[in-house]
A protein has these predicted regions:
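Histidine/lysine/aspartate-rich catalytic loop segments that bind and position anionic ligands
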Residues: 125-142
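Conserved small/polar residues in nucleotide/adenosyl-binding loops
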Residues: 144-146
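Active-site loop/lid in soluble adenylation, ligation, and acyl-transfer enzymes
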Residues: 2-122
Length: 146
């Protein structure tokens, strides 16, 4: 049975949906992300062949099926296959504490769950400082899960 079918079966057995925008990381076992990439690579190769692209002789297209599989799993849809980052709150009580509003600018590359095409944008996250703050990088890392 293929890795994707095993994961789908686990999701179905647990009564969980697996729509394009859903995070399914709790149902992926160690090593299965790489197995999904290996499973997808020849399928992406078939898509390229269907588009009449010479993936054997065109040096730019040689190995592109594998690169596409890696890009979808590890980058464009990373929020689907990776758990949400753990955010630790730190005391904001030192002499150099933050006061007022902090603004985090984050460039975002994701995927439209309807057209499955790349979406790029910029998010500005405003944080009102209080007694505790989470690390600023966690706000950016959390964006891939939205």
């Amino acid at each position: 049975m293929s890795t994707s079918k095993k994961i789908k079966q686990r999701l179905k057995d647990a009564g969980k949906r697996f729509w394009a925008g859903d995070n399914i990381s709790d149902f992926i076992e160690d090593g299965e992300k790489q197995q999904l990439i290996d499973e997808l690579a020849p399928k992406f190769e078939e898509v390229l062949q269907g588009l009449v692209i010479d993936t054997e002789n065109d040096p730019n297209s040689n190995g592109t099926g594998k690169r596409l599989a890696k890009m979808y799993i590890n980058e464009l849809m990373a929020g689907r296959y990776e758990p949400m980052p753990v955010a630790t709150a730190f005391p904001n009580d030192s002499i150099d504490r933050y006061e007022g509003m902090l603004v985090v600018r984050s460039e975002l590359t994701s995927m439209c769950s309807h057209h499955h095409q790349i979406v790029r944008g910029v998010a500005y996250i405003g944080i009102i400082a209080s007694e505790k703050l989470i690390g600023l990088s966690k706000y950016t890392l959390s964006l891939i899960h939205i």
